[in-house]
From Swiss-Prot:
It comes from Rhodobacter capsulatus (strain ATCC BAA-309 / NBRC 16581 / SB1003). This is Protein CrtK. Belongs to the TspO/BZRP family. The lineage of its organism: Bacteria, Pseudomonadati, Pseudomonadota, Alphaproteobacteria, Rhodobacterales. Keywords: Carotenoid biosynthesis, Cell inner membrane, Cell membrane, Chlorophyll biosynthesis, Membrane, Photosynthesis, Transmembrane, Transmembrane helix. It comes from the Bacteria. The gene is crtK. Its main location: membrane.
Amino acid sequence: MSLTLFAVYFVACACAGATGAIFSPGAWYDSLKKPSWVPPNWLFPVAWSTLYILMSISAARVSGLAMENELAVLGLAFWAVQIAVNTLWTPIFFGLHRLAGGMLVLVLLWLSVFATCVLFWSVDWLSGLMFVPYVIWVTVAGALNFSVWRLNPGEKPITL
C-alpha cells in the first residue's frame, strides 16, 4: 500500500469530516426528540475517525490494483461518490436542519457505501472487509436519522 495514496484518500476523508466542525450539532440538535437507543455523543468522532482511516487504507490498497483490474477503477469511482455524499449530510442535517433531506442523503450514502464495499471485496477481500463497519455504521445512522425525523414532525418545507 502506498502511503502517498493513503494520505490523498485520508485528506479527502478529513475534508468530509471537517463539515462536522463547520456545522456542529449545537442547541438545535440537543432540543430534538431522539430514540432511547441513540449512541452517546463521544462515540461519533471515535467512530468516524476509525472509519475514515479504514476507508483510506482500503482505497489505497485498491488503487494499487487499478491498473490491472477494471472493477478496482469502478470501486474507486464509487468511493469518490460515497465521500462526496458523505460530505453533504452534515450541512443538510445540522446546517439546514432538514431531517428529511438528511434521510435522503443517508439513503444515497448507504447505497454508494454498499456498492463500494461489494466492488472492493471483489478486487481485494481485505479492502472490502474494511468497509463492512462503514456499512453497519451508516445503517445505524440511517435508522437514527429516520427515528429523529419521525419523532420531530413539522419540518419546514424546503423553499427555493
